């Protein structure tokens, strides 16, 4: 029975979604923690928008 609890906990940890991947980024701290930059108006060339930085018109941009 204890093996089932251990198996369940490992499955829960490995199948848990990663933060910042499935949820939208909406503040500068989360943006910077994900390795991205905050940029006004639009993302620079070769960057992809992955969220916003909290202020209107400010985008969270990351290199793919």
From Swiss-Prot:
Function text: Exhibits antimicrobial activity against Gram-negative bacteria and Gram-positive bacteria, with highest activity against Gram-negative bacteria. Antimicrobial activity against P.aruginosa seems to be salt-sensitive and is reduced with high salt concentrations greater than 25 mM. Also exhibits antimicrobial activity against the yeast C.albicans. Permeabilizes C.albicans cell membranes via targeting plasma membrane lipid phosphatidylinositol 4,5-bisphosphate (PIP2), thereby leading to cell fragmentation and cell death. Acts as a ligand for C-C chemokine receptor CCR6.
Protein's organism: Pan troglodytes
Gene3D superfamilies, per the entry: Antimicrobial Peptide, Beta-defensin 2, Chain A
The protein, known as: Defensin beta 4A
Cystine bridges: 31-60, 38-53, 43-61
Encoding gene, per UniProt annotation: DEFB4A
GO CC list: extracellular space; Golgi lumen
GO molecular function, one term: phosphatidylinositol-4,5-bisphosphate binding
Family matches, as InterPro entries: Beta/alpha-defensin_C (IPR006080), Defensin_beta-like (IPR001855)
Annotated spans, Phosphatidylinositol 4,5-bisphosphate (PIP2) binding: 33-48
Lineage: Eukaryota, Metazoa, Chordata, Craniata, Vertebrata
Signal peptide: 1-23
